[in-house]
């Protein structure tokens, strides 16, 4: 991008691009420098330039960018993948839920408020209370991608001064090349796009947690209105089927709820870059996304295998 725009020599841009396709930097080789510098980029750039063995071209590597530009842009490329995987899982879960909701739309069962019998509802209606919020989250993804999957290229203090008069065009073209969106500004200390993605993932995990909590109750001994599949065996009580999958989902939901608070605290940056806030984000955001992905994985299997116990539902209504 920079070479084509004349920000750096075109031949150097081509050489750097070609080298990036051929050179594989060993992550272990930059571990020590990452620990010393608090970020991997200085060691990565140094190792890459050494492997290039073309100092006349490698001198233009990382031109006009700062470590945070690299880290944040790479983060958004990973968030894009995470959202795609989540979208696929949500669609699979919704298919399973909609099939059951349609099949058992008229199957009566007791509704419960404060865990006590209330007026009758149906298994289809119960499933709809889980599926509709997931559908809402799914429908938000296109807007979320536009508003949050941003490129970062703003330089050391967020001013883009090192890129000269073509700074805006360089950022725009880089965004297009990577399939990201151009925020048209620096967002080094504005973690709004990160929070949007994390909040969306946390909300999905909470929706799944509500489903898991209800399934724990419905599969409990003495109620037995839903079976969950073949998992959850006990080593000493073979008659039991422990609700392992819904328990895991609820636990993940609880964990994400706490981490979300920490991530919001990490959005408070001092000056133009804040190491404490940045490091806190690194410790919380990956776990929010991974826990959300794990909850989706459990829910995908659970929604495909849970089975209503018709006789018990009917008997519970008297």
Where are these regions (language model features)?
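A glycine-rich, basic-preceded beta-loop-alpha segment at the flavin cofactor/substrate interface
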Residues: 61, 179-187, 226, 261-272
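Acidic, glycine-rich loop-and-beta core segments that form the ion-binding/anion-interacting portion
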Residues: 169-257
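A structural signal for small-residue-enriched, beta-sheet-centric alpha/beta enzyme cores
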Residues: 67, 164, 170, 177, ...
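Glycine-rich cofactor/substrate-binding loops
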Residues: 1, 32-38, 223, 237-318
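Short amphipathic alpha-helical segments with heptad-repeat character
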Residues: 35, 80-87, 91, 98, ...
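Generic, well-ordered alpha-helical scaffold segments in large soluble proteins
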Residues: 47, 51, 96, 100, ...
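A helix-coil-helix interface module used to build multimeric assemblies
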Residues: 1-154, 160, 166-171, 244-248
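Alpha-helix capping and helix-loop boundary segments enriched in small/acidic/polar residues
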Residues: 70, 110, 114-125, 161-165, ...
